[in-house]
Amino acid sequence: MNDPHLLIDAGNSRIKWALADARRTLVDTGAFGHTRDGGADPDWSALPRPHGAWISNVAGADVAARLDALLDACWPGLPRTTIRSQPAQCGVTNGYTTPDQLGSDRWAGLIGARAAFPGEHLLIATFGTATTLEALRADGRFTGGLIAPGWALMMRALGTHTAQLPTLTTDIASGLLAGAQAEPFQVDTPRSLSAGCLYAQAGLIERAWRDLADAWQAPVRLVLAGGAADDVARALTLPHTRHDALILSGLALIAAEGAAQD
């Protein structure tokens, strides 16, 4: 089967897509908002008709309906598969006690990470609306994870639920901290809030990495992904690897496995 696969990652903040060729290479990519207010619709008119669409959607029913409408407008009747976490798939074994409770984005990311770093123990940190951590052993066993508020959500919660603290976006906070992160403590409220929430992210990652390395008594590669990864990386004292296509790469593997079974 040489037809490309359309891959869609509908996250809590935006929707990313890619077209994967027969070698699972992402040959076209893009992103758009949950609604038209979040930006223009994707222009898929120049793309070849794909074999089908494989979708990870953690954004809910309204986004699912929007995706269906976009796909039907471009390719009426295109087969589509909305993935769910499985007990085992593409070389990864799901360690959740109830496997289908694991978010489909995290599942696809685990599959993508195992393919990107075969034979390595991994801690995968993804920075979105939530910050998620996944522990993946070299043999493909996902042993569990952690979920915390993301950097933006932490700052928004403080601004919303206090009388005197500002509500800061990550763009504002990143600008405030440019050149200021070398100082361990900040000297005004906006920078103190920005740095405190950022260091909370970094501290979580470093504690989890050390606990994992101690528990496994082996080297663990730290892999960072997601929108706030650059900012969090500057606050880390650990070596790390950046990879921003784990979910789409995992979807490409799931799509290839599914197409081979057709």
From Swiss-Prot:
Its main location: cytoplasm. Keywords: ATP-binding, Coenzyme A biosynthesis, Cytoplasm, Kinase, Nucleotide-binding, Potassium, Transferase. One of its GO terms (cellular component) is cytoplasm. SUPFAM superfamilies: Actin-like ATPase domain (SSF53067). The gene is coaX. This is Type III pantothenate kinase. It comes from the Bacteria. Disulfide bonds: none annotated. CDD domains: ASKHA_NBD_PanK-III. ATP binds at residues 9-16, 129. It is an enzyme of class 2 (transferase). The lineage of its organism: Bacteria, Pseudomonadati, Pseudomonadota, Betaproteobacteria, Burkholderiales. Its cofactor is NH4(+); K(+).
